[in-house]
């Protein structure tokens, strides 16, 4: 990734505009989970220490454009950052036309960028106004890098200098290492309820990986494609032919999609539903598959332990209910123990990592959802592409 990095620049006395991803959950005016703020502080602290006049903005929620609302205000975020810095970080409400000053080594929070007209549509006029506020634009919001908006793309076109922040650089380096130059064997684990929502990811990965592990509802469609009864389990019958095609395509190049040999079933989706272990060929018409069995989990664990690279996106069972969580737990522990480079991303995956307490034992955890998936699909991320173009133009 040939982009200018913020750490390559002299920021002293410069007006620095950071687009971060501070879209955090808020309840009763307080931030309830500040992982994204923590992840963004590296870039913010760096720019402050370098003597920049630092402005940071983000979206929060989905407000109506052009209308300020308390529920989508960045005030709780500004309070959280002020506490971290031990000094106030001013929240500036109407900032698009300037009308505010920032001192060297000071941080101001620019109110939710989605309150601004033209933000979502990437309006040129809005982007140019943003660009006039700064000498250096720092894109650090990997979570929105797949969207071309005024604060992620437009400003990068017009700012005097456009660069990548520390978090964005780390994300891109980790994804590049895992997907573009992977150590072999390469294993991808893709879970989730539906093949249809991850179809392009599965198709793209099926051409790259040595083993493509499918989990959750997705695995049921592949089980059916392998000729097994899946009972009343979540399964997309219309995509069974595509599952077969992916299995055949991978087999032709000696790669595999491992199919479960045993499963854990119940009769209904309920936290108190008893778990029943069955061989995969013994599922009855009224069963619902909620997890893989211990034999299948051991097989997958062995695959992970022998891997050079593991990409994890999605659990392999209904791990929210402990009786259907053993498969995901086994996989999580193998990912923690393997010598492979491990990359994980997606909300459910991060929830599993937290539940099984392996956060510090995964090589890299991506904070992004949609952008992570689009990178896995092999798509170009617009906000990264524009940084590459600006870097090429500055040589």
From Swiss-Prot:
Pathway: Carbohydrate degradation; glycolysis; pyruvate from D-glyceraldehyde 3-phosphate: step 2/5. Disulfide bonds: none annotated. It is found in: Cytoplasm. InterPro entries: Phosphoglycerate_kinase, Phosphoglycerate_kinase_CS, Phosphoglycerate_kinase_N, Phosphoglycerate_kinase_sf. Keywords: ATP-binding, Cytoplasm, Glycolysis, Kinase, Nucleotide-binding, Transferase. Belongs to the phosphoglycerate kinase family. This is Phosphoglycerate kinase. The lineage of its organism: Bacteria, Pseudomonadati, Pseudomonadota, Betaproteobacteria, Nitrosomonadales.
């Amino acid at each position: 990734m040939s982009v200018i990095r913020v750490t390559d620049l002299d920021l002293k006395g410069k007006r620095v505009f950071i687009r971060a991803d501070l879209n955090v959950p808020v309840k009763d005016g307080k931030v309830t989970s500040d992982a994204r703020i923590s992840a963004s502080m590296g870039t913010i602290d760096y720019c402050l220490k370098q003597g920049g006049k630092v402005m940071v903005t983000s979206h929060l929620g989905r407000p109506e454009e052009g209308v300020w609302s308390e529920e989508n205000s960045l005030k709780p975020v500004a309070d959280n950052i002020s506490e971290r810095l031990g000094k106030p970080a001013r929240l500036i409400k109407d900032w698009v036309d300037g009308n505010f000053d920032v001192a060297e080594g000071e941080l101001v929070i620019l109110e939710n960028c989605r309150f601004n007209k033209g933000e979502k549509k990437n309006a040129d006029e809005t982007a140019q106004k943003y660009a006039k506020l700064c000498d250096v634009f720092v894109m650090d919001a990997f979570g929105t890098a797949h969207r071309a908006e005024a604060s992620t793309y437009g400003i990068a076109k017009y700012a005097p200098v456009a660069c990548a922040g520390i978090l964005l650089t780390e994300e891109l380096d980790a994804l590049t290492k895992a997907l573009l130059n992977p150590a072999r064997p390469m294993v991808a684990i893709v879970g989730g309820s539906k093949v249809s929502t991850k179809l392009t990811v599965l198709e793209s990965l099926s051409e790259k990986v040595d083993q493509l592990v499918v989990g959750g509802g997705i695995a049921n469609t592949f089980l059916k494609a392998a000729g097994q009864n899946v009972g009343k389990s979540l399964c997309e019958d219309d995509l069974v032919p595509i599952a077969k095609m992916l299995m055949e395509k991978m087999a032709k190049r000696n790669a595999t999609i491992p199919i479960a040999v045993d499963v854990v079933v119940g009769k209904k989706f309920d936290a108190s539903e008893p778990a029943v272990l069955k061989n995969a060929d013994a599922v009855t018409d009224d069963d619902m598959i909620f997890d893989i069995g211990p034999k299948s989990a051991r097989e997958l664990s062995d695959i992970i332990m022998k891997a050079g690279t593991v990409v994890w996106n999605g659990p392999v069972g209904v791990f929210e209910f402990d009786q259907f969580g053993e498969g995901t737990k086994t996989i999580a522990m193998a990912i923690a123990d393997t010598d492979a480079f491990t990359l994980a991303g997606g909300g459910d995956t991060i929830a599993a990592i937290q539940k099984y307490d392996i956060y510090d034992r995964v090589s890299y955890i991506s904070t992004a959802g949609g952008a992570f998936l689009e990178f896995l699909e092999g798509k170009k991320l617009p906000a990264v592409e524009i940084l590459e173009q600006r870097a090429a133009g500055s040589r």
